Amino acid sequence: MRLLIDRSEWGRLRVTGGDRTRFLQGLTTVNVEKLADGQHGWGAILNPKGRVLSVIDVARDGDAYVIASEASIAQATRALLERYAVMDDVAFEPLSGPAHQVWDDPATAWDAPIVAGEAPSGEVARPETDPEVERLRIRAGFLRYGVDVGEDHFPFETPLARFLDYGKGCYVGQEPVFRVHAQGNAAHALRGLLIEGAAPIAPGTKLDAPAKGEVTSSVADGDATRALAYLHRTCWEPGAAVAVAGRRATVHELPW
């Protein structure tokens, strides 16, 4: 399944200056020092307590980096960068124009960069609100800031965990992230739920007792509902049977 998704409304910043690599290395979870020209990496900007302030894609573009973030947090992301850049030789240039992302399947959605330019000839970029985009997004565990992740969450509780480089040097929020990793005691994690019945579940709906968890996103898919939910470690194992809003559900690892 190939989906070409319109990302023209996303915020994109070109980062230049002599301190660009050191600055981003010390502020984001992305190991920018490892990015070769043309490569990209997903990650986050954290607060000092290790909570997620922004989800970003960082792409190496010659002697610069391009940072992309959702439209809803584009201004906040730029403000964060500028706040930390007081004594650094860095400059931020907003980029505009068409952009898109290509998803071939849920397993590779997080590998897809944000690409500047028009859609390939003969293809039409779908809006983010397209039901097919939402179904694949949920199967991939592709986060929406303010919906599936926010200032209450650690990156290791989300699919961003796969991008955390524990061999990287210091960055803002690193200590609590490394501490929990070393102790191995995360309490919650984002998982997929396949729920009986084709009626979406309201965000914030709690799982039925005794399971502990909360739905963040959901979408009807055939005669069932697919959802993302933060589950407590006592019920997050793939294949576990839980219930939400009186409906039976099965836990799935992400992507699925």
Name each region found by the language model.
Residues 114-194:
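Anionic-ligand-binding alpha/beta catalytic cores of soluble enzymes and soluble regulatory domains
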Residues 1-53:
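Acidic, proline/glycine-enriched N-terminal capping motif
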Residues 51, 158-164, 172-174, 178-256:
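Glycine-rich, small/acidic residue-mixed loop/short-helix segments
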Residues 5-27, 93-104, 185-196:
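Short glycine-/aliphatic-rich beta-strand segments at the starts of folded cytosolic domains
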Residues 38-39, 87, 141, 146, ...:
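Glycine-centered loop/turn motifs
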